[in-house]
Amino acid sequence: MTVSEKIFSKASGTPVKAGDFVLANIDLAMTHDITGPLAVQGFYEIMRDEEDKKVWDPSKIVIIFDHQVPADSINAAQNHIMLRKFAKEQGILNYDVYEGVCHQVLPEKGHVKPGDLIVGSDSHTCAYGSLGAFSTGIGSTDMAAVFATGKLWFRVPETFRFEVEGKLPERVYSKDLILHLIGDVGVEGVRYMAAEYAGSTIRSLSIPERMTMSNMAIEMGGKAGIIEADEVTEAYLKERIPGFKLDPYWKSDEGAKYLDIRYYDVSDLEPQVACPHNVDNVKPVSEVEGTKLDQIFMGSCTNGRFEDIKIMADIMGDEPVAKNLRLLVVPASKTEYMKLLKAGYIEKLVNAGAIVEAPCCGPCMGGSFGLLGPGEVGLATSNRNFKGREGSAESFVYLSSPATAGASALTGEITDPRKV
């Protein structure tokens, strides 16, 4: 069995294989300030004839505010009020406006472990696959049903395995790797499949680097992006879950059936950039060098961790942000922000001319601050560059690694980080 088939077998209480339809028990459900209100409304519609309108298990639900925080409109403030009230009445854990982005906060707070089946009303919920869970995004209506029953229907997905070998070259990172994979298979290359990342390259990645890989599985259509839990996973979770011990069961068996297996050698991989207006429009940085930039957004659930921002800041050194360039830095969580603060990186970036914001989704969703105007060109370490994603539909967004963002911050144009 693949690890995904094992997780669905556990969740449904019976052995299953890819293609089977199952009613699965959910281990953890997450919603946030954008999709949460509709889920709450749907929950009360489902429960309208029930005298006791309580969720199935409040200990298995997390509500977090991260998209429009602090509230940037009256409507956002009303959504926050509604969700705070719901969380209090139901006894649900609510991470308020100061904690950070859901896909960073849940793992760092110990809510995720190998073998879990996790759903979130956000498309990048697949990020938790970095810790060996099967996690996937669902809509608000499905989330309402989960709130009420703790169960959800699934078709057990086929698995598309990416075998990656070789040592990543200097200043080439997991963001470059995942962009390369997406560029290779396309935005629908693994539609409704579990993307399983394996090989010596993947095993060498830190948890933050693995989070980047799993986070972007959805950008090639993946239902999940899963990485086998190992000693790296165990070390990370032991710091967050008291008494955690790694169960070797949660990995794919030898002889497991895959829909496809692709093999890659990354020894000569160069930095990658996704060009407007699709994530699979990927080119080596050498083909887009010199593209003038108006703004760089360093952050998001894809690359907003301490490790990411440190890479950018170290490349920048003591040099200032390029003239006429806006550099927005948004750490992914309060925990990551404090690590950066204590290490001196926040002060260093502010002195360089960067705008450092409190932990949140920031410009990534295009509905808050730091938006691009018509004709402006942005470089972001986030996960999507659709037309209008970070502001005007007449703007242009390129996606890159933190290293490429750091090099480009010095020059005001897309720059190969190996050249600075």
Swiss-Prot record:
EC number(s) from the headed UniProt entry: 4.2.1.33
Cofactor note: Binds 1 [4Fe-4S] cluster per subunit.
InterPro entries to which the protein is assigned, alphabetical: Acnase/IPM_dHydase_lsu_aba_1/3, Acoase/IPM_deHydtase_lsu_aba, Aconitase_4Fe-4S_BS, Aconitase_4Fe-4S_dom, HAcnase/IPMdehydase_lsu_prok, Homoacnase/IPMdehydase_lsu, IPM_dehydratase_rel_enz, IPMI_cat
A Pfam family it matches: Aconitase
Keywords: 4Fe-4S, Amino-acid biosynthesis, Branched-chain amino acid biosynthesis, Iron, Iron-sulfur, Leucine biosynthesis, Lyase, Metal-binding
UniProt cross-references to PANTHER family, sorted A to Z: HOMOACONITASE, MITOCHONDRIAL-RELATED, ISOPROPYLMALATE_CITRAMALATE ISOMERASE LARGE SUBUNIT
Name of the featured protein: Probable 3-isopropylmalate dehydratase large subunit
Taxonomic classification: Archaea, Methanobacteriati, Methanobacteriota, Stenosarchaea group, Methanomicrobia
Gene that this sequence comes from: leuC
